[in-house]
Amino acid sequence: ACAAPPPAAAPPADELEMWLGTLKGSQKVIYDCVMPAGGLDGILFARNFLKFSQEKLGTKDADMSVIVSFRHFATPYGYNDAMWAKYPQFASMLKVQDPKSMKPAARNVPLHDEIEGFPGASLPALSARGAQVTVCGAATAYLAGILAGPKGDAGATEKELLANLVPGARVVPAGVVVVQRAQKAGFAYTFAG
């Protein structure tokens, strides 16, 4: 008797699934950064995954697909220094002090400094190793409304935030959507806090 051929894989349902399909590493993980400390922990966890997979197991960066997803209260880590300087609410909301000045951060600290002093635990270092960053579009719209206030233009503020993402970041409809789609695409899920 002949076995029936396996069903053909369904084509990607949308742009997000198509993008996830381009991430070809056999070792796949998404770090779900939800709370303020989770943004920093997600960066550190991604660094540890890349570092120790390579050093202890010999896994090459090309064989690893890593996503750090900033959503909910960790979303501001997806914006560049200009937005952190313009909107001091990010530092107060996330309770982030600049380790150089010991004052509320007026810059996106992980764009410049290594988390907890660990070499390679920064956004540029992760990017150089092929890690991807996603930024929650739903949280961005919510934050834009808060930043604009009742008399401001939330739509214009949202456009400004989306035009000022950290280098290489990708906006996604919602962080919960990329988390689900990544798991569907074979990514292991890690809650970073």
Descriptions of predicted regions:
Residues 2-193:
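Secreted/extracellular ectodomain signature
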